[in-house]
Amino acid sequence: MDLLGDIVEKDTSDSVESNDNGTLSTNNCGTGFPELYKPKKISSWKERLREKRAQKKKTSGKDAEKQQTSTDAPLSEAKSIHNENIKVLQGMSDEQIVQEREDLYNSLDPKLIAKLLKNINKRAKDENNTPLFAEIEGASGTWVGGNKQGIYDLPPLDDEDVDVALEIRPMLGKDAKHVQFEEAGKEKDVEEEAKTNDDVDDIAPLDFQMAQCIDHMKNEELFKDVHFIKEESQNEINLEKLDINDPNFNDKLHEKYFPDLPKEVDKLKWMQPVQQKTDKNYIIEDVSECRFDFNGDLVPPTRQIDSTIHSGLHHHSDSPELAGYTIVELEHLARSTFPSQRCIAIQTLGRILYKLGQKSYYQLVPEIDADTYKEDGSISNVMDKIYSMFWDLIKDGKVIESLEISSDEKFTRNLSVRNYAIDALWLWKQGGGDFRTKK
């Protein structure tokens, strides 16, 4: 028995094999391998999975189409305004529509309404060849515009007219890649308008303007406003030294050290000594010149200022040679920023108000001549007139209002100031206040 034989090549292109089920299967000549086995029956799970995938593809395709249509064809301004107007009309009742029509006819010119209706009819003829509204005869208060059911028949606004009214430029398409520049003349007009319409914030601050001016100034111009102490020359060294007790001290000081500056004598008056002697025949012509001490008593003008150093009645106000404080000065000190100074002034004002209400100023002895006696009568009438002048001064100076503000915690934080103000108001009430109000 021969085990080895000749090797014979077979033709595989037409080779056909049969399966167990009697079906024929052909080999894949392209790859040289048999095809994968694909069973005919598919499980129910795979069928449901395929259905879900197909449904997702359909829904995603529809959404993409909707998005594409919405992005490709956006609503114009005219269309959006038209839709908004229709929504507003849908939400209105027939009575409201009639009322709005009457308001329009009463407020607008009939010629203007006729022109608007003519434009609407013109657009409606272009679409339907029939006018939407009848001709109007110009009678105010008559409406021929239909009812609420015909709001859907209203033609939309013209896109070009709306864009011109809203100053909207036409948008270029996606495929357009060219750039359009405005004319140079328009840019110049805009710049000129911007220059003429300067805002308040566009103006530079004063300090910045001064700094800019200084940058463009020469050194000679800058040194005109600047002065320095000159070096002592040999002639100045030989001059005699200045004596502060010299009556011409200010003139010599200016001549030696500041000859280039103008003389300002008024600013040096505070350096002058206070007048020591007062006129014994000093007459107080007005109650605003009366001065008081811290107890609320009157201070005569003959009292020397040297004797009041320990009591603190010397001051730097008007007439520093006179001791004490006037009501006007005390009211000014009652609004001081220093609480201690404010407390003393408020306490003094309270005592003065009490004594004015009690009429306890026995120092007020007026000189009554014949004319005064004929005009006012007795001494009591003259005294009442003087006290009335004091209360008028307090009213004009708003002393009571100032004390009320000082006693209010909303306006005054310092507790001591509030307590002194409350005490001063209490003294004012206890004294009786203005005697004229009692009558």
UniProtKB/Swiss-Prot annotation:
Residues 15-30 have a biased composition (Polar residues). It comes from Saccharomyces cerevisiae (strain ATCC 204508 / S288c). This is RNA polymerase II-associated protein RBA50. GO terms for cellular component: cytoplasm. Belongs to the RPAP1 family. GO terms for biological process: transcription by RNA polymerase II. The keyword Glycosyltransferase does not apply. Pfam families: RPAP1_C, RPAP1_N. Induction: Down-regulated at low calcium levels. The gene is RBA50. PANTHER family: RNA POLYMERASE II-ASSOCIATED PROTEIN 1 (PTHR21483:SF18). Residues 1-35, 49-79 are annotated as: Disordered. Forms an interface between the RNA polymerase II enzyme and chaperone/scaffolding proteins, suggesting that it is required to connect RNA polymerase II to regulators of protein complex formation. Keywords: Cytoplasm, Transcription, Transcription regulation. It is found in: Cytoplasm. Transmembrane segments: none annotated. Its main location: cytoplasm. InterPro entries: RNA_pol_II_AP1_C, RNA_pol_II_AP1_N, RPAP1/Rba50. Present with 688 molecules/cell in log phase SD medium.
